[in-house]
């Protein structure tokens, strides 16, 4: 029956026959050795913006295309609607959202944009700021295969990009978006899609909820089907307003003397079910293209600035509980929010294809309310109010949640184990402020039944370094190093089934020695490798607002690395393509 049954070898993860089943290829031993290759469409010497992020690999076949909207201008603060009708018969091997944006040359701030359908968020991103002479354009993609059930009916969608367009802010944003449905074929099996997709937004127009403090929540009360076997909540917590630069914040008693925000420099997204702690997600320190110093991001934006990626919280231990026939309230909050975070969520629910009812429940849960972050204040202030010394903020937690579900696969024990550590150290002198921050998270989901177990392990690291200095002439220099590293590993008791590493690093510098011209530079390096033979490495560089280099590295075969990548994978680091972890495996050992 169902779109939610996946046997990894059969569904083109190609664990035993990578190249044949996934459309990859191998080079002949007589081939010319690969070389660094200039990136097509990225001209050195250009003032255009550029990103090294990969596009999504595609399955074979011609997609059926549904245009959501085209060349739509944005002005004002109202969502614009579009009509969606299912025009592409399924099943689908892959579904991709493509969106293209531009802002005319002129003056305009960075803005946030959302695309939603039936209240479900499909894309969240922010815009590239223009300049007087440069009209930026950019292209973003998201793998929406897991959303397939959402696209089965006619419904209304919305897009918003709140902005002011007038004589002062005259940069005009516009955009287009479309869905590409790739057909199933002999070489492209049906992709994994959830049976139910639930929105966590502020309403039918798919806008986020603004959470002002730790007590603010985004909640949905849902009557779930009686046969839930897996549940995953994708969360985006986007810092705004007073919280935009939350990593520069300080305890409330130091906020005024340091002229910064309060509530400490620690934030955390928390998930509960019926007021019981159910999961935790780190908050990524996104920096938008008008943030800190817009000159840092004029050519190369910060990590994920144009395409914010959600963090997945595995709620599968609660599958038995959610199947009990009672409504359940799932809530999202942000610890230490201080006006405010824009929060969105999407809940993916997979059901048993053979039973209309399953049962089970939670057997252990050590997740509790967090302790306050530890603050180490080594600051002193001179008579002029200048701070010197260090201010450290740390937090850490470990927890385990286990549940059982009795399904058509027998009794499974699902255990989520997570450890998280956070450190933020701010160093002050009379002429500088330096911030060194890192968040590290390790999450392992283990699905076990007698004689077999499957584990998905995900580790994420979010290093951030910022340095602000002022020279003797009062000129400011700002440097930034921002990175996200994600490692995914899927294994059973026979060994590793799939492993992948994604690393996205942006380094930027801006110095304004007035009246001399500003000196600005930036680099981005994006790499992705996996156990199926994927290899992607793109490097960009810019100097003084001009692109100086854009190469696909020889170590990954130069140009064409996306085309050689197995189409199933997500080089942006997502795991949705793996489907309902554990439930998709034949525990007899045959699949």
What are the language-model segments listed below?
Residues 12, 16-39:
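Bacterial Sec-dependent N-terminal signal peptides
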Residues 87-96, 224-232, 243:
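Extended extracellular/luminal ectodomain segments enriched in beta-structured repeat modules
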Residues 33-53, 60-79, 83, 87-88, ...:
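Beta-strand-rich ligand-recognition modules
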Residues 162-231, 354-408:
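Flexible, low-complexity coil/linker segments
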